[in-house]
Amino acid sequence: MRKIILQGMVMVLAFLGIWFALERIDWEGLLKVNQLTEQTEEKLGELLNDVFIKESPEIYSRDVVEPIDSIVSKVCRANSIDRSKIKVHVLENSEVNAFALPAGHLVIYSGLIYDAGSAEELSGVICHEIAHITEKHVMKSLVKELGLSVLISATTGGGSDVAGRIANVLSSTAFDRKLEKAADIKAVGYLMAANINPEPFADFMYRISDGEGSVPEYLSWVSTHPDSRERAEYIIDYIKGKEKKDYKPVLPAAAWTKMKNYVKRKI
């Protein structure tokens, strides 16, 4: 009996020793996973952006592009984010939605601009998506949902069906709660650093949770960002713990009105 117990202990210790040794190996460096992922991300970002633009034409009107660029640039400057790494695309689509793509592509649907109650509300959503980009949530989620092999196949001639599947995941699947909360809190920090009032971001969350948007049937953002009321509440709690600032309007009233009027004609 003692011999059997001793053999069992030896096997357990051997297993633990092998496990410990394997844990200490830099598998990412050995297999160049990071490099592979970066290369894949660049190709994937371009591929998916093309998929979405084919479905919804990109808006190039200065009435829309300039105000959006102003918001994004202001946030990037205030938070030491490389503006050239954030590639913004405003698409003509009535869905109330915005989402991040690999390689820093940020898609904003005109329906979101139309539904937003203020430039500050819109800024909150934009900052939330920028946070997903800066925190590398996009590729983490795609690898988790689909696997690296599927992503690689899409960039090496895997076919439009694979790209379409990935695009569907990004535009219609929620990040997990932990990543969403991290992006929310990061977004509030970005807003405050840029001297943009973060409370309208929480107001937007409250409003969509009640289905009070101008076009509730198109509230795609709420389907990919669930628990909006709960998130609005912890955003407000987080803001309360910060020093109050004298926030300035993120856009001139005339620029906001022009942009709203433009997208209204497209809805």
Q: Can you annotate each of these PLM segments?
A:
Residues 1-267:
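A Zn2+-metalloprotease active-site environment signal
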